[in-house]
Amino acid sequence: YPTMIAGSSAGSTIGAMYAASLDPDWMENRFKDLISGGKLAALGDMQVAGERESSSIWGQVAQFFKDRVEIILAMNKLGLMDSKKIREIIEFLLPVKTFAELQIPMIITATDVQTGQAVLHDSGDLVEAVVQSSTVPGIFTPAKKDDMYLVDGGAAMPLPVPALQGKVDYILALDISKTGLNKLDRYNMYSIITRAETIRGMHYTRTLADQADFVIHPDVGDTHWSRFDLFDQLIKTGRQAAEQQIDLLKADLSRRKG
């Protein structure tokens, strides 16, 4: 078993489940129970839709004004959904409530949108730490703590390698960031800005991955984070990536020990 785990965003949930249970089979079944139980229905369809186009001029005008109303509403809201919805999901997935109950020490990252700094949690309320690290900006309302507004740990540290540096002898990074980009169907201001931000994030994640001793990076393509319907396929993809790398990982560990 690893001597310490660090997790950001989805990695905080997976890491906490493993650190608590040490049982990958239980984790997989727990997620299947979550999906089949309908708890994810509360999140709705969070996939980012492409550009909408109406065949009529009046439809285009109506969409023009609708988009501007949405922009005005967004300027006055912290998120589309209250973070209590994701808290319910995290509470269902985690078998323990505090860091002290974990079988492996863990560090969970969140991001303070006031300062842009990563906030590291390693004690106290485990559920709250995972909720903060999983709070997708704009989708869920951020957590308020003192003067901080805390959101997804992946914003400041998508791959929390720095959180483990100096604390362990060997860092194995599990990178589930996009491995490719789909061709843009339409070129417009929104799609170009979004694509540029995606590219920036991909390159920053690679920079963090370069700081690890070994990296396993499953080929998830351009899969959106909300594609829960692809659960079985993504599990298979992750397992195949690990199996393909396991001999190289063992050889690297042996070389360093020798």
What positions do the PLM features span?
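Patatin-like phospholipase
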Residues: 1-8, 16-258
